[in-house]
């Protein structure tokens, strides 16, 4: 069931912080603080600086978000 009061945005990881928090730079230039979603934590998805991610940002607090997906990396 999707939440209605979130905005889905793309960005990349700038910095890994303690407690599974990350600093994310969005494609529109804003920097936010984001944490890993429970499903990613449960499945041991590793996120490193430089990874492309999909972030859900609440419309009530545009400085915090939840990382819901790590984009696949093309190995060229």
From Swiss-Prot:
It is found in: Cytoplasm. Its main location: cytoplasm. InterPro entries: NA-bd_OB-fold, RNA-binding_domain_S1_IF1, S1_domain, TIF_IF1. SUPFAM superfamilies: Nucleic acid-binding proteins (SSF50249). It holds the Pfam family eIF-1a. Signal peptide: none annotated. Keywords: Cytoplasm, Initiation factor, Protein biosynthesis, RNA-binding, rRNA-binding. PROSITE patterns: S1_IF1_TYPE. The keyword RNA-binding applies. It comes from the Bacteria. GO terms for cellular component: cytosol. One of its GO terms (molecular function) is translation initiation factor activity. CDD domains: S1_IF1. Residues 1-72 form the S1-like domain. Component of the 30S ribosomal translation pre-initiation complex which assembles on the 30S ribosome in the order IF-2 and IF-3, IF-1 and N-formylmethionyl-tRNA(fMet); mRNA recruitment can occur at any time during PIC assembly. Belongs to the IF-1 family. PANTHER family: TRANSLATION INITIATION FACTOR IF-1, CHLOROPLASTIC. One of the essential components for the initiation of protein synthesis. Stabilizes the binding of IF-2 and IF-3 on the 30S subunit to which N-formylmethionyl-tRNA(fMet) subsequently binds. Helps modulate mRNA selection, yielding the 30S pre-initiation complex (PIC). Upon addition of the 50S ribosomal subunit IF-1, IF-2 and IF-3 are released leaving the mature 70S translation initiation complex. This is Translation initiation factor IF-1. It comes from Petrotoga mobilis (strain DSM 10674 / SJ95).
